[in-house]
Amino acid sequence: ATRGVCYRTLQHQDSQVNKLEISPDKQILAAAGNPTIKIFEVNASNPSPILTHEGHQGNVTAIGFERDGRWMYSGSDDGTVKLWDARQGSRHTREYESRAAVTTVALHPNGAELLSGDANGNIRVWDLTMNACSCELVPEVGVAVRSVSVASDGSLVVAGNSTGTCYVWRLQKDAKTTAHFEPLHKLRAHPDEYVLKCLISPDVRSLATTSSDKTVKLWNLDGLGLERTLKGHSRWVWDCVFSVDAAYLVTASSDGSARLWDCSSGEAIRVYNGHHKAVVCCALNDSAVDAATG
């Protein structure tokens, strides 16, 4: 990523790529498409997927791994959240019905709860032990939730929606579940535009928001003051990912490029070109300083 040189291209010929995620052990790359999830080996020369997860009936809009990489989760336009064995290409092991197209899914650091957002404006907490929805929030009725992020220490949840607003809640301290949400802020991050991604930094000091207004904004989580506006993309900015030390941010845009930003200066230090269409997702492998884009 630091050199800005493409050293490998993986073909995903069945559909567009909606989301990318690298496993915690940095060995596999998961690509969410329509309607499957394909698994590639990161450090092998094999250009073909080694596994394909089938079961969704629509676009897969969200994917992720639990911290040990044993299982995966996904969300889809088909209105379901599913769990998968990450190492076997079998059908899903568990399914939750959301009653609306699922747009985003995040795993609580306790590993026992998933938070999903949908096109009808609902946020649901799925208790994996109880195997049921334990809590439901509706920040704005009928306004699609585009992105949900949970702090690495479990202290905060942020949700961004289609009116450009981010909602911030504090989670009950020392709670084993996230059933208690304390509203903290209603942030007009990108007024009259879409918040396409909101992401809490690994050190829980900053919030990144990407938008249809072509910008990325960095906010201080202590008071939610605006720290930086990152400008350079010429079309919608769909996705972002922090480096593990929160010093850098990678972004993906419809302008066909991805960018690497220095968060302290707000400068783009690398621009990655090569895609012939919109770049809508990105993932970062900090152990090798590699970025994946799709």
What are these regions (language model features)?
Residues 98-101, 107-109, 114, 119, ...:
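Core solenoid repeat modules with strong leucine/isoleucine-rich periodicity
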Residues 1, 37-42, 81-85, 123-126, ...:
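WD40-repeat beta-propellers
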Residues 32-34, 75-78, 117-120, 160-163, ...:
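Conserved strand-to-loop turn within each blade of WD40 beta-propeller repeats
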Residues 5-8, 48-51, 91-94, 134-135, ...:
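A structural motif specific to WD40 beta-propellers
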Residues 11-17, 54-60, 96-102, 138-145, ...:
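WD40/WD-repeat beta-propeller blade N-cap
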